[in-house]
Amino acid sequence: MRSTKEKAELCRALHAGAEPTLSAACWDVGTAYLLAHVGVPLIDTTSFGAMATRGLPDAVGLATREFMLGNASEIAAAVDLPVQADLENGFGDSPEIVAQTILEAGTTGIVGGSIEDATGRPADPIYPLELAEERIRAAAEVARALPFPFMLTARADQYLWGRPDLAEVIRRAQAFETAGANAIMVPGLNDPVALKSVCDAVSLPVVVLIGAGPTNPPEIGCDRRKAHRRWRGHGSRGALGLCGHRPGSNRRARTRRLAGRHVRPRDHRHLPEPPRQFLTGKLATGRQY
């Protein structure tokens, strides 16, 4: 089993590679094992999936730091892969609370995590830019002091909360880069022209979230080294379709077509298989819900 530092270095290398990286999210140890089995190189946790195991909704402030870090710690200990955690909004409004979350995350075995600029309050869903930047700066300062290279992803959640302002997203992405983030994520943004604008506006890897929008992510005409894919949240159920065929093996599950999706016979859940582009690296797209 790799050490946390070795996993962290692998995570950084995957983000810096010449090809886009596909990661997928799991919600417990069992789903982590399945994703590791099919050759996914990088695993994320998901608050959507973790909360669903408790029969609770996501994105309304019910996920606690203790629960999400406990979930991530179990997953990180179970697989010999880098694991990044869904750290919600840092589990509090103030930069100090966000910093404490990163400090505690650094003891769990995970090698990275995402911090949202969403408050979790529908009436006032997005933090002001100045506060959002301060929160990322506080997180980055703690992350840099950890004994391994923690991958800090800053999220601009405007599109998820019905505020599709591309100019504001770009301002935030640039501010988060200045504040010390290592990657940018814009969940819900799937327009290829807009995504290219975000990629061109920052020097960091950009993450495209598969699942909060079209199933097949678009082509983006940006540097392939800057674009990474994540299949997360409820969309991660689709990634489990990979379990019918392990890349590199000669064994293939028989499939049939159902509503335009490949489905394994007798699979009552009808989990769709990911598009073949995910296995060939054809798409140049960016990344986790």
Regions found by a protein language model. Give the residues of each.
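Alpha/beta enzyme core
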Residues: 2-14, 20-230, 236-244, 277-278
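Extended, intrinsically disordered, low-complexity segments
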Residues: 2-4, 232-283
